[in-house]
Amino acid sequence: MRHFVIPDVQAKPGQDFTFLRKIGEYLVEKKPEKIICLGDFADMPSLSSYDVGKKAFEGRRYTKDIEASHNAMTALMSPLWEHNARAKKNKEKQYRPELHLTLGNHEQRIERAINSDAKLEGLISYADLSYELYGWTVYPFLDVVVIDGIAYSHYFVSGLMGRPATSANAQLNKT
C-alpha cells in the first residue's frame, strides 16, 4: 500500500498554485493508493493573531483566504478529475485513491477566531473550506489517524501542555 504525504501547503491569496497541479499530475502518474494531507492546506492569514495591528496585516480578508484554498485544491485535484473523465469516456479504470486530511493549526484559526469572538459563530466555519466536497475524509486538528499501521497527525504533542513533540531522534534519546 503506497502512501503519498502532502505537508503544509499553506495556500494564501496571491500565490501561484502551479506546483499543486504538478503534484496532481505526479499522483496520476504514480497512483498511490492513499493520499494524506497533514494539515495547513489553507494558510488563513486573515485570522492570524501573529501580526494583528501591524501595517502588513491590512487588506487580509477571510473570503480571499477561502477562495485561495479552493483555487489550490482545484489545482491539486484537477489532474485526477481530468484523468478520470478520460478514463470514463474510454471505459477504463478510474483512479480513486483514499484521501485523508488532518486539519492543521492554520485551519484551526477559524475555531480560535470563533472562540475569541462569538459573533462569528455561524458566519465562518471549517465547512467554508469544503474539503469533504473535494473527496477528503477530514480529521480534527491534532487527532492521530492510523492508516495501514502508520500514525499521521499535523504534529504530535508531548506532555500536558499540548506542545509539539520534538524530533523522533530526540524522543528516542530522552533519558
Predicted regions and their residues:
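Conserved catalytic scaffold of divalent metal-dependent phosphoesterases
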Residues: 68-175
